[in-house]
Amino acid sequence: MLWTYDMMSFQKIYSPTQLANAMKLVRQQNGWTQSELAKKIGIKQATISNFENNPDNTSLTTFFKILQSLELSMTLCDAKNASPEAAEQQDLEW
């Protein structure tokens, strides 16, 4: 499970599709097209489209390039004790 930060709230992420949708929303909120984001990180627009529409086949390398270009980070939490507060505390400990 992964928490994403969206509009002052945390969202639990349970699937690659949810993750891709959350990252697509961030891209759109920043006013970037798929082409603009792809150019920013040196990949093809089709690669961004494939990630947003079929994230199961995206390599981890591509995923992290997109994540970094969107100025996002990822925090892993113990699913049994997951909460926004736990995620923030874990982030503070690093």
Swiss-Prot record:
| Single annotated GO MF | DNA binding
Stored CDD domains:
HTH_XRE
Q: Which InterPro entries match?
A: Cro/C1-type_HTH, Lambda_DNA-bd_dom_sf
DNA-binding residue intervals: 34-53
A Pfam family annotated for this chain is: HTH_3
Complexes and interactors: Homodimer. Forms a HipA(2)HipB(2) heterotetramer which can interact with DNA. This complex also blocks the toxic activity of HipA.
Q: What does this protein do?
A: Antitoxin component of a type II type II toxin-antitoxin (TA) system. Neutralizes the toxic effect of cognate toxin HipA. Represses the hipBA operon promoter.
Q: What is this protein called?
A: Antitoxin HipB
- Organism encoding this protein: Escherichia coli O6:H1 (strain CFT073 / ATCC 700928 / UPEC)
What gene name is listed for this protein?
hipB
